[in-house]
Amino acid sequence: MSSVPPVLSGSEIRSKFLEFFNQRQHPILPSASLVPEDPTVLLTIAGMLPFKPIFLGQQDAPSPRATTSQKCIRTNDIENVGRTARHHTFFEMLGNFSFGDYFKEQAIAWAWELSTEVFQLDPKNIVVSVFREDDEAFEIWRDKVGVNPKRIIRMGEEDNFWKSGPTGPCGPCSELYYDFKPELGDDNIDLEDDTRFIEYYNLVFMQYNRDAEGHLTPLQNKNIDTGMGLERMAQILQQVPNNYETDLIFPIIETAAKAAGIHYEKADEKTKVSLKVIGDHVRSVVHMIADGITASNTDRGYVLRRLIRRVVRHGRLIGIDGNFINQVAETAIQLSEAAYPNTRERESFIKQELEREENNFLKTLERGEKLLADIIAKEEKQISGVDAFTLFDTFGFPFELTQEIAEENGLTVDAEGYQAEMKKQQERSKAAHETIDLTVQGSLDELAEHIHPTAFLGYTDLQSQVKIEAVLVDGHRVETAEAGVVVQLICNQTPFYAESGGQIGDRGYFSGDQLVVRINDVQKESGFFVHHGKVERGSLTVGDTVNATIDRACRRRAQANHTATHLLQAALKNIVDDSISQAGSLVDFDRLRFDFNCPRALTAAELTQIEAQINTWIAEAHEGQVAVMPIAEAKAKGAVAMFGEKYGEEVRVVDFPGVSMELCGGTHVKNTAEIGLFKIISETGISSGIRRIEAVAGPAVLEYLKVRDQVVKDLGDKFKAKPEEITERVENIQAELRNTQKELEKVKAELAIAKSEALVSQAETVGEFQILVENMGDLDAKALQTAAERLQQKLGEAAVVLGSTPEDGKVSLVAAFSEGIYKGKKVQAGKFIGGIAKLCGGGGGGRPNLAQAGGRDASKLPEALHTAKQQLRETLG
């Protein structure tokens, strides 16, 4: 029998890995975004991807070594998600990297040390593979590490020659597998047997670059790239049957199960697959949106949309009819926020995007499912290309989703027919633009063949006459729209500002004879300003000339916030660090947000100084100037540009002399005095090295202060205190609560001791030891531990195992063993109680003499305690 490794949480595994390599001169670097800088891939698919330019010699390494926990997304095996024990779309890759520093022998030695000493895997449970031609790696494993040659398996290029993609860095690799059944022996080892083996660590010896023709060129430096799947190591150390039942994912599954009114443990296999799909995909979409990806019909936005729609559909399959995705998203955020704070900081944006996509799909899902049911009922073997295209074009079913549903029902889909229908639509568009099925997103380029891009008049005009060039309803081009219809309008010219540069689009209305169209958003697509609105009165026809009028109050507020954003950047440069640059922004009607690069949080004093500086500039009434000039001239004058932004030869410069000068296409106040007031609401970190300030300006400051004043008044009324006395009153209440909590804990401890005193006489003698196994009712975990320790001390050479159910459905377990048991009999409390906890659907561990564990199924506690007693009798007798 091989020894059992300690039970560690996913967070502990991540920390131990990073700490191990940090102690060996590997700086811990933050995870890169899921949106890669590499243009050859849509998403970050591997831990090494952020280092690809270094491996290629295109960039210098920040240090010769590094270690990371990298967020990754892969969807190439999406059909296996939930059906196998370890396929995921989102996963974390723990990695250690060497950039021309150490190589094969050191990488192998550290991998073995980490596995056997830090994670305490029994060497009997480890099998390694090497590339069939890599004799050097084979010899290191055999001669330096001491692995039995029978447990070193030579594999072909497909398995053990790693590459990041069709092109790029690559090299032979050596993989470490965990063997769940070492008792089966070393003869005829088949690493493809995933019921016995799981690959958990891959060591890539990066030596080559593969070009588009497949040629291998030696890299300038030999590098090391490794990857340990966090979810896989969690499965091993938490001793659960699959990655999904680890603490990294299972709480999400439990939330989904609760929303569906089902119990995971009692569910059939089909239901469990759906729950696992939801658990996996929700992790993916939360992190994708947190990293700035939004749903669309192209590229990574399409990947996001597809994942969200799979979540919604699998929710339907397990009986969830309405909205639920944000319930499970909240659990995913709770699980990730400690390691990835941007998930909590962008919570509002994440949930808005998820709810929008969920609602959009729910609108058409039922009708699409009915069409699919009708098709399946025909008992034909294949869904036609026409039907598949209808499902995509009319009901928003991604083609892959139709394929998946078809497969579940034993059908195939005519992919060629689907592509033919797609091609026909494109040809119809070219032949007669009047009959184009024109979607707002992705098809506006076709309009450019017939009309000119929209001319923007809004820098000088707040109202103008415009000609309606196109009317779209539900993304399709129509001639006329009647009252009550939601429309997207394209005009020859417009005073409406379209959302760009962080500034929100204008609001307002179109009017004419008996016509009113309320405009609530304006977006810029392919050179056209797309006005989103609703016909409130009358009707609208292509070719009509109407009056376009923006909401002046909204424009003034947006202008004030946009200019305030410029002043904020100037103040940050003046007060904190001149090297600060913009990383993103939002200019809304009632608030502003500014993201900037800074390695630390700003102090309260700095924030006060920044706010005071901006309000001083406002009071000084600086006149603004706007000019268009060559970009070289603008930069020579010191105009600030946004890092990474692409500019044309001619740029628009917004200048408040002596205060701020920036390249900007937005709308601004003519004088800083028009802003009125500026107030910082918060300063937070959104990712490594990026900070965010949220603020209000103009009338929004008074609204904000009014709300704050009301809060203070309400608190004063509740505490019967003056505003200046509230802080002291709250501190007094907190002190009282702390004292009460201490008293409560003291009472609980006394109760635990009293209960333990009464149990001493119930101990059973087994050989030279006493054993006591009892159910302690609803005693909490801390009191349970106190009771176990007290009983073991009273009984002397004894094994005490106590269980309780302090929360609805939850289990607490404690084991306290004397020295004669954990040293003399080699029975350790941590390993023992961890095994017992598994019977309750949980896990845990601790020291040899004292350990705690938990479980998810309270109904199994009596059985678990009975098993504990039987095992102790057998072991100690």
Curated annotation (Swiss-Prot):
Its EC number is 6.1.1.7. Disulfide bonds: none annotated. GO terms for biological process: alanyl-tRNA aminoacylation. One of its GO terms (cellular component) is cytosol. One of its GO terms (molecular function) is tRNA binding. Keywords: Aminoacyl-tRNA synthetase, ATP-binding, Cytoplasm, Ligase, Metal-binding, Nucleotide-binding, Protein biosynthesis, RNA-binding, tRNA-binding, Zinc. Pfam families: DHHA1, tRNA-synt_2c, tRNA_SAD. The keyword Ligase applies. It is found in: Cytoplasm. Zn(2+) binds at residues 562, 566, 664, 668. Belongs to the class-II aminoacyl-tRNA synthetase family. Consists of three domains; the N-terminal catalytic domain, the editing domain and the C-terminal C-Ala domain. The editing domain removes incorrectly charged amino acids, while the C-Ala domain, along with tRNA(Ala), serves as a bridge to cooperatively bring together the editing and aminoacylation centers thus stimulating deacylation of misacylated tRNAs. Catalyzes the attachment of alanine to tRNA(Ala) in a two-step reaction: alanine is first activated by ATP to form Ala-AMP and then transferred to the acceptor end of tRNA(Ala). Also edits incorrectly charged Ser-tRNA(Ala) and Gly-tRNA(Ala) via its editing domain. This is Alanine--tRNA ligase. It comes from Picosynechococcus sp. (strain ATCC 27264 / PCC 7002 / PR-6) (Agmenellum quadruplicatum). The lineage of its organism: Bacteria, Bacillati, Cyanobacteriota, Cyanophyceae, Oscillatoriophycideae.
